[in-house]
């Protein structure tokens, strides 16, 4: 909403310069063109937010369905526990490879001294 030209206060306090036969039509038209652009931008922003709201509402509904189906997932929790153990073993092996190589490099450099 960075491209909004006027606040409601700006519109309320706008003063047009009177001419011999009333206000300058070009001044009024210029102001109204800016107001129209603001309204168009507001409309686009509202439409974008509605679409985002619909998308997020659908996502919440989808996640709620997954959570409500969670009762069957909880019954299979031991399988998840085994999977977690497997992940921890893999992580431990990876750490040994990475940090073990660093330790070997440190030991080799200290033997050179």
Curated annotation (Swiss-Prot):
The domain of life for this entry's organism is: Bacteria
Q: Coiled-coil ranges per the record?
A: 32-70
Q: Please cite one Gene Ontology biological process associated with this protein.
A: cell division
Main location (coarse class): cytoplasm
Keyword vocabulary terms for this entry: Cell cycle, Cell division, Cell shape, Coiled coil, Cytoplasm
* InterPro entries attached to this UniProt entry: Cell_cycle_GpsB, DivIVA_domain, DivIVA_fam
**A GO term from the CC aspect:** cytoplasm
Q: Where in the cell is it found?
A: Cytoplasm
State the similarity comment. Answer: Belongs to the GpsB family.
- Subunit description: Forms polymers through the coiled coil domains. Interacts with PBP1, MreC and EzrA.
HAMAP family xref list: GpsB
**NCBIfam families attached to this UniProt entry:** DivI1A_domain, PRK14127.1
Described by its record, this protein's role is as follows: Divisome component that associates with the complex late in its assembly, after the Z-ring is formed, and is dependent on DivIC and PBP2B for its recruitment to the divisome. Together with EzrA, is a key component of the system that regulates PBP1 localization during cell cycle progression. Its main role could be the removal of PBP1 from the cell pole after pole maturation is completed. Also contributes to the recruitment of PBP1 to the division complex. Not essential for septum formation.
Entry's PANTHER family?
Answer: CELL CYCLE PROTEIN GPSB, CELL DIVISION PROTEIN DIVIVA
What protein am I looking at?
A: Cell cycle protein GpsB
Print the organism lineage. Bacteria, Bacillati, Bacillota, Bacilli, Lactobacillales
């Amino acid at each position: 909403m960075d491209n909004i030209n006027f606040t409601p206060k700006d519109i309320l306090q706008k003063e047009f310069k009177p001419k011999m036969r009333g206000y300058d039509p070009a001044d009024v038209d210029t102001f109204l063109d800016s107001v129209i652009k603001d309204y168009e931008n507001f409309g686009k922003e509202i439409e974008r937010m509605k679409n985002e709201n619909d998308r997020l509402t659908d996502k919440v509904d989808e996640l709620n369905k997954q959570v409500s189906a969670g009762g069957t997932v909880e019954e299979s929790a031991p399988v998840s526990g085994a999977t977690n153990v497997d992940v921890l073993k893999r992580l431990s092996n990876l750490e040994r490879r990475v940090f073990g190589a660093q330790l070997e490099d440190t030991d080799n450099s200290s033997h050179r001294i």
